[in-house]
Amino acid sequence: MLTYALVALGSAIGGTLRYWLSMVIAEASAGTFPWATLVINVAGSAAIGLFATLTSVDGRVFVPSEWRTFFMVGICGGFTTFSSFSLQTLALAQDGDWLAAGLNVVGSVALCLLAVWLGHVAATIINR
C-alpha cells in the first residue's frame, strides 16, 4: 500500500513540475516547435537514466525499492512517460538486442503518432 501512495505522490510532484516547467519554457520560446515537451522529455530521460544507474545493484547509492519506484515511476512517470520508454530502450540496447531496441523506437513513435491522429479523427467526428 505504501508503494501505491508513493507512486501517487511522485506522480503529483512530477506532473506539477512538468506543468510549471512547460509554462516557463513556453514564455521563453516563440514559434510552433514544441520546445517545452522536448526539453521535458529529454530532462526526464536524463533524470531516470542517472537515478536508475546510481541506485542499481552496482550503483553507488542505496535506495530502498519503494523509493526507487517513487522517483522512477512516480516523479519521472508524472513528469514524462518518455523517460520510462528511454530507459527500457537503453536496457534492450545494452543487452545487445538492437533489433528490439530499434523496433521499440520506431514502433512507439509510429504507433503513438497514429494513435494521436486516430484520436483526433474520432474527436472531430464526435464534435460534428
UniProtKB/Swiss-Prot annotation:
It comes from the Bacteria. This is Fluoride-specific ion channel FluC. GO terms for biological process: cellular detoxification of fluoride. Fluoride-specific ion channel. Important for reducing fluoride concentration in the cell, thus reducing its toxicity. Na(+) is not transported, but it plays an essential structural role and its presence is essential for fluoride channel function. Belongs to the fluoride channel Fluc/FEX (TC 1.A.43) family. The chain crosses the membrane at residues 5-25, 32-52, 70-90, 106-126. Na(+) binds at G77, T80. It catalyses: fluoride(in) = fluoride(out). It holds the Pfam family CRCB. GO terms for molecular function: fluoride channel activity; metal ion binding. One of its GO terms (cellular component) is plasma membrane. Keywords: Cell inner membrane, Cell membrane, Ion channel, Ion transport, Membrane, Metal-binding, Sodium, Transmembrane, Transmembrane helix, Transport. It is found in: Cell inner membrane. It is a multi-pass membrane protein. The keyword tRNA-binding does not apply.
